[in-house]
């Protein structure tokens, strides 16, 4: 099985085993023979269900951020870009479902290249947005006053734009090499040596598109926990409740993100060292880890929306579940730039250092 992006299908080398390590001819890598029965129907149905859930949840996030003026905070700008990336990421699933149902790619080489490139761009953008959000959370919690000059909507927009541009640059190999194979599937057609190019690509995407961002995320939240624990000792029970909320958010964000993507990259990396057997179980494993990686986009509206009181109230307003004016002011950890300046002017210098350690952090 060749390591690939989720938008492609699991592939086995049609030539000798030597081709997997760079030797042999450059014969087409084709998908596994379609399995009769439940899987041929179940996999496309699962793809479409994940697509519907992801599109619905992330579209709702986009709408409430754009609809309510008070939702346009720095953090929500990152959440908006994450939701846009997830929506575009979900749009590739109907094509993937069709290919798996029909056992070939019926949309032509141009759309194959476009879908795989967009899939790569939005995968990277989602990870980078999550990383930038974690850095922003670190600044908001650990340095709430001194970071005010950097935590502005303009800076957030520039950082988000940089994430999109960087993602496009990192996805250029897919734009260049994605094509319809002889077997009729949409895949990456690497030049000689095929095995070396494939191995370099999967290591490149795993390190820069998963493990390095995850390391940054873990470091940011570790520093947040250290800061909250240190502050919690001084401010008593209320602060300890905030500490528990931050810790819970850390666990949810890191574990769900890692849990959804780690199996996919693990399967691909293991396959570099030990070729997975050409049997239905391997194809089933691959389909499972691909669906799990897409399911992370369904979880994002829950992680970054429903755990926020402001998002929850906005969702209820939009869905007509309650009466009200929509979102309240920004989260307590998300003071608007003008409020930060007013705080700094009104707060005596002797108390500003204490404010850095005691600012409310219960709503992330």
Curated annotation (Swiss-Prot):
CDD domains: 7tmA_SSTR5 (cd15974). Residues 327-342 have a biased composition (Basic and acidic residues). A lipid is attached at residue 320 (S-palmitoyl cysteine). It comes from Homo sapiens. Keywords: Cell membrane, Disulfide bond, G-protein coupled receptor, Glycoprotein, Lipoprotein, Membrane, Palmitate, Phosphoprotein, Receptor, Transducer, Transmembrane, Transmembrane helix. Residues 1-38, 102-113, 179-197, 274-283 are extracellular. This is Somatostatin receptor type 5. Residues 67-76, 136-157, 223-247, 309-364 are cytoplasmic. The modification Phosphoserine is found at residue 325.
